[in-house]
Amino acid sequence: MSKIINSVEQMQIEIDLLAQNVVRNVARIMTEKLKDFIDTDVYSYPETWGGRTGDFGNSWEYSEPIFDFGYVESIISENLMKIQFDGAWSHGSNYSRMEEFNLAEIINNGLDSSNFNFPAIESRPFWDNWMMWANTEFDNLFISESKKYGITMNRSLSFK
C-alpha cells in the first residue's frame, strides 16, 4: 500500500521513521550476536560454583533509537540492575561491592588473583571477539537492513 506524502515535513518524518527502524534492527541483531559470544565464550565453560543464573548474558540490551544532532543512534550497554546480587558470594553483593570495577571487564580480561569474590580466572574474551565481529560485519549488516526499507544511509560505528 502506497502512502501519499503531501509535504516536505511529512516526507522527513517518514524517512526518520525508516531510519529508526533500520537502526533498531541493527542494534537488535548486534545485541543478539553479543549474547551469542557470551554463550560461547563465557557460558561454555563448565560450571564449578553452582547456581549459574545466566543473568550476565541477559544483562545486555540496546536503547530505542533516538535522533541526536541529525544522527539516529542506539546504544548497546550492560544493565547491571538485571543481575541478581544476593548471597555472600554474589559478585558485587553487600559483602564486596563492584563499584570501581566492571563485571564485563573481569570476565573479558580475567583476573590474576582473587578479587571481588572472584577466584583468579582466565580471560573469556567475549567482548574482544564481539568487537572483531562488529568491526568486520557492521557495514554489511547496516547496508542489508537499509535495503529492506529501500533507503541508503551513511553509517558509523563508535565504541565508548
Model segments located where?
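Short, Lys/Arg-rich flexible segments
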Residues: M1-I75, L80-M81, Y95-K160
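His/Glu-rich zincin catalytic helix
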Residues: Q84
